[in-house]
């Protein structure tokens, strides 16, 4: 049913099992028979085979003498970052460094919101990640001896850099989204205290680029902390649904746990006018919102009520729901992503299923694609901005899965016995983080993904995409 078709390189699992076995050396007597020598050679070959790393699949039990090692040859780039308090949500900020950047070292800007131990300790973080070099190592490099001095100097030069600017934020940041608007960069934040606020983060982005500006900003913010451009307190409960319209600058949609969705529009006073009449249709918490990538009045939402709804904001709020996929998942629907180039929406739920919906037959047909790999609720899903058949999903099973829906199984392909039950569309499994909450593809850095988890951030690019 998919319009895409192309060949794709073999899928890769970057984690491998390494067996930590003792080496047994037996000295042979000079009078050993030829058959004994042959037996010894066979045993040595068998032990060598046992000691070779094997591909690891999630939930595969490890023996006492086994541990996991990351295969660096599966990554073009892999970096980790810590922010102190973990971040439930973040967004990648578009910059002026150019599109389609592939030359290392790379630079990325993000805005994130913390989940601190106390509501008054939370911050919005404006972050610059720079000097991001390739970390690729061929398999044979692992066994080569280090040229210590040269390598240490080179490693020091290639250390990634991270620079922060902080904005104090009342309450945990449930979700945060950034947009460019009138020569400024704005961030909308959903607070656990029930407020949705819009911040101008242009000054902070300039500060992380210039040490002198950052020092001045930090001093000024002690007595004169940044204030939001606008704060909306009309939601009756906290929420998670939040998205800027990509085709109508400054327009925002926010959805709460009470089931209400409000549409924001910028006004001439430099703030926002929020329609106090919520969109009517859902019967439970709004979990995610996605505006159409090409129709400025159309958006999609998903909910704990297990429906996905398509809305037209030109209609009256009680008539704005135009299409509904009932019982789209067996449990709560957590996340959706609208493909930027094709009429498809991907959804992920508490049931661990990843569904793909064709908007041309949305209400009357089942999903055109269903994939079951995650063993726990899916927490994030996003289509690739460049390759329309590629998407990424993250789950509470501590996995990030990369998919190419254009791939079909080749009947003549030789498949490892351990991999034969995996969907052929599954390209790559990224692990190493605990409690992954959100992922985003970088629009300007092809193939680069940023993820946030309880254990911090990862920014990586695989050999598969």
Spell out what each predicted region is.
Residues 130-133, 154-156, 193, 198-229, ...:
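Per-blade loop-tip surfaces of WD-repeat and WD-like beta-propellers in eukaryotic adaptors/scaffolds
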Residues 79, 88-91, 174-177, 185, ...:
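Structural signature of WD-repeat beta-propeller blades
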Residues 438-465:
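Blade-level signature of beta-propeller repeat domains, shared across WD40, Kelch, NHL, RCC1
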Residues 94-97, 106, 180-183, 246-248, ...:
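Residue-level detector of Asp-centered blade-edge/turn motifs that repeat once per structural unit
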Residues 21-91, 95-166, 194-225, 267-271, ...:
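Beta-propeller domains
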Residues 87-94, 171-178, 236-244, 283-291, ...:
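Canonical WD40 repeat/beta-propeller blade segments in eukaryotic WD-repeat proteins
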